[in-house]
């Protein structure tokens, strides 16, 4: 695997080279790699301490866990001072248990965000000799860029790939790269369109013999199976593979630096970038990409700081050592029926864990810019994707106990599982918090006695309940505050986000909109958890990439029941006590207005109006990199062509 293999151009009129392929593939000679299925019942951790692990990684993790436990212990002690006087009921015990778990959850995020903030402000955390400001290194090995696709618009898809191809060519090192479109498309008319657009792309850029296309006849194991099929057939020609998503765009500069990082660090198995979300047009997409651009680095630098050489894999915009992947990332089929059994859905976490078990270092480089993706245009589209992620993360319950995994790899999976269980836990915490004063007050609903949860909690603890609420909200919102402070300290980023005042207004509006959507997300994530536990499979559909166009009937079908439930609960609370209704208002209002909120945030004109006002601006809009400009030009031109699908 010295990267010296030369690929000869493949004619475009060849029949399928394998019974594994459908349609008319155009492929290089095969160079198979064995990719054995890994056992979850056997195995051992090959290397405990990686050479590339940062100094003091043990102290970093001690800070994270120790800080989380200390903050949680203090909060629990104060909560006990609220609950203990006058006895300790079953409901209060439930409240305390939920509070411990949820406060520990947000305390860990807070501790990680603080570390990320310090790293960002200090401009530290650079790894593996990858310096974005240094001259572009020269490469010595071959790398394959893989773009899996599933029932996507081929013109839109290959416009992004063409922009990447041209950007790599501008580095002067195109000879070190080949590009593969790996289709799992099941709709025949889309498959034929893919072949046509692929041929047009090769003619346009002179990519024959360097850009290849393959569609699987059987798309078993979804994306993981798609990539594994390529590794088993062609991986021997390429020491590295860079995995893209259908909406991924990366600069040639960033790609070259990633490859050089792999060449210079032979014990590194994977390098994950931090993709910036771009090209949002709707209000929802723009608030998401603004939040990711301002708060995202704080969170990403924080986790990279304590992950060290045991980082995670997000499934795309990452470079992987092909041999290491083949040797250790062959996924087994999980025992049992769907949704917990069968093929591994959230394969990226598991592949990273197995590669780390095999002795390879896994790193994240959040400081390396030039990596981009797109977000869902509407809350509805986000929640559809989130339902699939929910099933994939809960499925990790069957993997987390696998033999030989590094404890940080297990922690990644537990965090993924916990993310979805926090939604029903927040709902239960709210209900129990209301139920305790209701039970203690002995309410007679027929008389409609005056009742105030706020007064109950405040009076029972000399204000400690209010103190807990304030501290909880501070810990919850701290990443936003830290992201804003970091933005203020970076003049270029601050100007690119509209300036200090507009950025502050953007954060305020994003926080309000997120609060209004939170009850909807909490309800649907909770429903997703219960559906998975009840055995309901999420399926696999193509994602919506362009602006959402949600009809009112669709909105009513999706959120009408939640709105009616919110009205019912609000009315019932008001009949008990207006103060109780006021206490529940933050949740009830979000439920009641879910239809108009989702409708307004799904509009392109709303998002663009705020952009003109300088709200939710990101640096990639003020000074877009050439690769994004080119991708947008190509996609606009493609949109003018006669439709193929």
UniProtKB/Swiss-Prot annotation:
Q: Per its UniProt entry, which superkingdom is the organism in?
A: Bacteria
GO-annotated molecular function: hexosyltransferase activity
Q: Which cysteine-cysteine pairs are annotated as disulfide bonds in the entry?
A: none
A GO cellular component annotated for this chain's UniProt record is:
plasma membrane
InterPro entries noted in UniProt: Glucans_biosynth_gluTrFase_H (IPR023725), Glyco_trans_2-like (IPR001173), Glycosyltr_2/OpgH_subfam (IPR050321), Nucleotide-diphossugar_trans (IPR029044)
* Membrane topology, record value: Multi-pass membrane protein
What residue ranges are annotated as transmembrane?
64-84, 98-118, 423-443, 465-485, 504-524, 558-578, 580-600
Q: Please state the pathway this protein functions in, per its UniProt record.
A: Glycan metabolism; osmoregulated periplasmic glucan (OPG) biosynthesis
Where does the UniProt annotation locate this protein? Cell inner membrane
Note down the stretches annotated as region Disordered.
1-28
This protein's record includes keyword Zinc: no
Q: What class of enzyme is it?
A: transferase
State any GO BP term from the record: glucan biosynthetic process
Its EC number is 2.4.1.-
Q: Does Glycosyltransferase count among this protein's keywords?
A: yes
Which UniProt keywords are given for this protein, alphabetically ordered?
Cell inner membrane, Cell membrane, Glycosyltransferase, Membrane, Transferase, Transmembrane, Transmembrane helix
Q: What does this protein do?
A: Involved in the biosynthesis of osmoregulated periplasmic glucans (OPGs).
Q: Which PANTHER family match?
A: CELLULOSE SYNTHASE CATALYTIC SUBUNIT A [UDP-FORMING], GLUCANS BIOSYNTHESIS GLUCOSYLTRANSFERASE H
Family statement drawn from the similarity comment of this UniProt entry: Belongs to the glycosyltransferase 2 family. OpgH subfamily.
By what name is this protein known?
Answer: Glucans biosynthesis glucosyltransferase H
Organism per entry: Xanthomonas campestris pv. campestris (strain B100)
Coding gene? opgH
């Amino acid at each position: 695997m010295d990267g010296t293999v030369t690929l000869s151009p493949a004619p475009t009129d060849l029949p399928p080279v394998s019974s594994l392929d459908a349609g008319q593939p155009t492929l290089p000679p095969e160079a198979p790699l064995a990719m054995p299925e890994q056992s979850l019942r056997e195995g051992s951790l090959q290397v405990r301490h990686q050479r590339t692990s940062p100094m003091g990684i043990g102290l970093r993790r001690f800070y994270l866990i120790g800080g989380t436990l200390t903050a949680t212990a203090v909060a629990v002690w104060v909560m006990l001072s609220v609950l203990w006087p006058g006895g300790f009921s079953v409901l209060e015990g439930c409240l305390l248990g939920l509070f411990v778990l949820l406060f520990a959850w947000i305390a860990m995020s807070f501790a990680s965000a603080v570390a990320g903030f310090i790293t960002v402000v200090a401009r530290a955390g650079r790894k593996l000799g990858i310096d974005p400001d240094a001259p572009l290194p020269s490469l010595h090995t071959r790398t394959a860029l893989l773009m899996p696709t599933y029932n996507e618009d081929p013109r839109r898809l290959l416009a992004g790939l063409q922009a990447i191809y041209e950007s790599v060519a501008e580095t002067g090192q195109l000879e070190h790269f080949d590009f593969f479109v790996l289709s799992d498309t099941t709709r025949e008319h889309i498959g034929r369109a893919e072949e046509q657009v692929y041929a047009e792309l090769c003619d346009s850029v002179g990519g024959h013999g360097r850009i290849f296309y393959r569609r699987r006849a059987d798309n078993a194991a979804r994306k993981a199976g798609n990539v594994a099929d390529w590794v088993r057939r062609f991986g021997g020609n390429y020491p590295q593979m860079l995995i893209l998503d259908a909406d991924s765009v990366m600069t040639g500069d960033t790609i070259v630096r990633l490859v050089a990082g792999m060449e210079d660090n032979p014990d590194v198995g994977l390098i994950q970038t931090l993709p910036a979300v771009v090209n949002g047009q709707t209000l929802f997409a723009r608030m998401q990409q603004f939040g990711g651009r301002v708060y995202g680095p704080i969170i990403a630098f924080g986790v990279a700081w304590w992950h060290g050489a045991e980082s995670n894999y997000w499934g795309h915009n990452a470079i992987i050592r092909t041999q290491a992947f083949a040797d250790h990332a062959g996924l087994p089929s999980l025992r049992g029926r769907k949704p917990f059994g069968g093929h591994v859905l959230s394969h990226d976490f598991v592949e990273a864990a197995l590669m780390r078990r095999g002795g390879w270092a896994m790193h994240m480089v959040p400081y390396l810019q030039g990596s981009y993706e797109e977000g869902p245009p509407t809350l509805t589209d986000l929640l559809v994707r989130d339902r699939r992620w929910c099933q994939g993360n809960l499925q990790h319950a069957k993997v987390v106990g696998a033999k030989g995994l590094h404890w940080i790899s297990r922690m990644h999976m537990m965090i993924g599982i916990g993310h979805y269980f926090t939604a029903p836990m927040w709902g239960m915490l709210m209900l129990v918090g209301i139920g305790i004063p209701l039970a203690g007050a002995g309410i007679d609903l027929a008389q409609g006695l005056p009742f105030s949860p706020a007064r109950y909690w405040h009076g029972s603890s000399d204000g400690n309940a209010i103190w807990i609420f304030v501290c909880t909200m501070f810990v919850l919102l701290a990443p936003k505050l830290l992201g804003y402070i970091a933005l203020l300290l970076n003049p270029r980023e601050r100007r690119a986000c509209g300036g200090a005042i507009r950025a502050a207004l953007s954060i305020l509006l994003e926080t309000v909109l997120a609060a209004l959507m939170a009850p909807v997300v909490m309800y649907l994530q909770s429903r997703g958890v219960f559906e998975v536990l009840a055995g309901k499979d999420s399926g696999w559909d193509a994602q919506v990439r362009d602006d959402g166009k949600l009809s009112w009937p669709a909105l009513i079908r999706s959120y009408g029941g939640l709105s009616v439930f919110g009205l019912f609960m609000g009315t019932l609370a008001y009949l008990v006590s207006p103060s109780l209704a006021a206490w529940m208002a933050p949740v009830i209002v979000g439920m009641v207005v879910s239809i108009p909120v989702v409708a307004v945030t799904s509009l392109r004109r709303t998002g663009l109006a705020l952009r003109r006002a300088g709200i939710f601006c990101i640096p990639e809009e003020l000074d877009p990199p050439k690769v994004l400009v080119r991708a947008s030009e190509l996609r606009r031109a493609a949109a003018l062509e006669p439709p193929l699908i």
